[in-house]
């Protein structure tokens, strides 16, 4: 990294000629002349000269460093390597790999019984038979219009770079669609259930206020004060408040 490190720039300035003409230096001289008792009237010009030198050196250094960084960042881009180099050529996006199948050969001909497989809509020229030498058929299919079928060791190709090959009576299939399944919705929070009685039937009600039910289940008394609200988990009906006796009924 030593070659990329910028060198210390060389400043070609005649500070003895440009320093008195600098407007900031002239303002500093005026401040010193207007205030003879200025504490730094001796050290201020020298300190300001050092400040100008350091500032100019820093600006040149930053400009050179930025130029070196631009040259380094504008180089050729590195080729993007595949994550798995040994996986071979990748299929085109949206195309699934062709299926491949392999199956065992049929029994030899001669005295072996002839087994005719059921014809489920397959042409007669594609139905394998066990006469003489064994012959089979394999098929491969993909979810992105990739399909291949062959007889014996045949192979089929598709619109995508992938192909399917089958031999014997094997069959293979692959789904090559790159469409990702939608994420599952988050689970709903579990509400604790407590038993309760609604319309004479025992039901399980969630904790908290329920829509359609009164907040207080007690009846109002004579003093215009509501009864105590029963807890949601209690199955006993609320007690009826006792009306106060009149003055005339004390002796009876």
Curated annotation (Swiss-Prot):
Residues 69-252 are annotated as: Disordered. Keywords: Capsid protein, Host nucleus, Virion. It is found in: Virion; Host nucleus. It holds the Pfam family Herpes_capsid. Residues 182-192 have a biased composition (Pro residues). GO terms for cellular component: host cell nucleus; viral capsid. Residues 94-109 have a biased composition (Gly residues). The keyword tRNA-binding does not apply. Its main location: virion. Residues 213-237 have a biased composition (Polar residues). InterPro entries: Herpes_capsid. Residues 83-93 have a biased composition (Low complexity). GO terms for biological process: viral process. HAMAP family: HSV_SCP_gammahv. Interacts with the major capsid protein/MCP. Participates in the assembly of the infectious particles by decorating the outer surface of the capsid shell and thus forming a layer between the capsid and the tegument. Complexes composed of the major capsid protein and small capsomere-interacting protein/SCP assemble together in the host cytoplasm and are translocated to the nucleus, where they accumulate and participate in capsid assembly. Belongs to the herpesviridae small capsomere-interacting protein family. This is Small capsomere-interacting protein. It comes from Alcelaphine herpesvirus 1 (strain C500).
């Amino acid at each position: 990294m030593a070659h990329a490190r910028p060198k210390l720039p060389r400043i070609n300035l005649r500070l003895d000629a440009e320093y008195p003409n600098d407007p900031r230096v002239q303002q500093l001289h005026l401040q010193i002349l207007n205030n003879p008792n200025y504490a730094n009237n001796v050290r201020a010009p020298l300190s300001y000269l050092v400040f100008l030198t350091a500032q100019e050196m820093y600006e040149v250094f930053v400009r050179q460093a930025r130029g070196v960084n631009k040259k380094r960042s504008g180089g050729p881009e590195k080729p993007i390597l595949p994550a798995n180099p040994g996986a071979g050529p990748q299929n085109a996006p949206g195309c699934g790999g062709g299926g491949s199948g392999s199956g065992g050969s049929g029994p030899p001909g001669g005295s072996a019984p002839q087994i005719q497989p059921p014809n489920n809509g397959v042409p007669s020229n594609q139905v394998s038979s066990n006469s003489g030498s064994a012959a089979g058929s394999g098929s491969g299919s993909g979810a992105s219009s990739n399909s291949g079928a062959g007889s014996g060791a045949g192979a089929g190709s598709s619109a995508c770079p992938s192909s399917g090959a089958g031999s014997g009576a094997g069959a293979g299939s692959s789904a090559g669609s790159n469409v990702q399944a939608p994420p599952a919705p988050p689970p709903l929070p579990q509400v604790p259930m407590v038993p309760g009685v609604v319309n004479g039937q025992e039901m399980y009600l969630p904790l908290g206020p329920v829509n359609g039910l009164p907040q207080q289940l007690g009846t109002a008394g004579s003093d215009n004060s509501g009864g105590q609200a029963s807890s949601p988990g209690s199955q006993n009906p609320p007690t009826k408040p006792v009306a106060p006796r009149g003055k005339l009924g004390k002796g009876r």
